[in-house]
């Protein structure tokens, strides 16, 4: 069965369409109007092994906040829909991602109890034209809407680009493990409750 989903969300602030195939090859077409954010989402798709299409039109004349946060919301919703009740997946995943002087780790639990632990510090307020505080907004929106407990921590690192990108890659690699089909579950949700 194909694990794909498409979600469309339109508000007065943003119009967003996300399509994802969890069992893809890492191909992506991303258009958010924010160059660095596009780069991060392309990296997320590539390292997660997800085929991903994102089309976002936001109120960038105000700032980037709505565009970044709302795209995280819709991406999380699309992945959750594609997971179909978390049936048959491994549920847990983790990754350590080095990027030159930076090392970031992510642990994820597809528990349907969303939570974000964020231990990431940036030495500069911007990378490219993007405010670095928006990376937490993305990860929070994503975790809340995919239904995942996400712990993301940069252990060390100086370069702002590397800190941001290693975070997206760590999330992608951890999620890639968590969404893998586990034949031992027999197609059921991996929980003693029988449902997530």
From Swiss-Prot:
One of its GO terms (molecular function) is imidazoleglycerol-phosphate dehydratase activity. One of its GO terms (cellular component) is cytoplasm. The keyword Lyase applies. Its EC number is 4.2.1.19. Keywords: Amino-acid biosynthesis, Cytoplasm, Histidine biosynthesis, Lyase. Pathway: Amino-acid biosynthesis; L-histidine biosynthesis; L-histidine from 5-phospho-alpha-D-ribose 1-diphosphate: step 6/9. Coiled coil: none annotated. Signal peptide: none annotated. It catalyses: D-erythro-1-(imidazol-4-yl)glycerol 3-phosphate = 3-(imidazol-4-yl)-2-oxopropyl phosphate + H2O. It is found in: Cytoplasm. The keyword Transmembrane does not apply. Disulfide bonds: none annotated. Belongs to the imidazoleglycerol-phosphate dehydratase family. This is Imidazoleglycerol-phosphate dehydratase.
């Amino acid at each position: 069965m194909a694990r794909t989903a498409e979600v469309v969300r339109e508000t007065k602030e943003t119009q967003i369409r996300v399509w994802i195939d969890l069992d893809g090859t890492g191909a992506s077409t991303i258009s958010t109007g924010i160059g660095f954010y596009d780069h991060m989402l392309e990296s997320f798709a590539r390292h997660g092994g997800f085929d991903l299409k994102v089309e976002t039109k936001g109120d960038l004349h105000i700032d980037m906040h709505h565009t970044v946060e709302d795209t995280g919301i819709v991406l999380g919703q699309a992945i959750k829909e594609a997971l179909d009740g978390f049936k048959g997946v491994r549920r847990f995943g983790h990754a350590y991602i080095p990027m030159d002087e930076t090392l970031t780790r992510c642990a994820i639990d597809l528990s349907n109890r969303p939570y974000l632990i964020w231990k990431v510090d940036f030495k500069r307020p911007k990378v490219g034209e993007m405010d670095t505080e928006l990376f937490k907004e993305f990860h929070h929106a994503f975790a809340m809407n995919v239904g995942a407990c996400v712990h993301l921590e940069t252990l060390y690192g100086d370069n702002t680009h590397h800190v941001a990108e290693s975070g997206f890659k760590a999330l992608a690699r951890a999620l890639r493990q968590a969404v893998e089909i586990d034949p031992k579950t027999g197609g059921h949700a991996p929980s003693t409750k029988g449902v997530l």
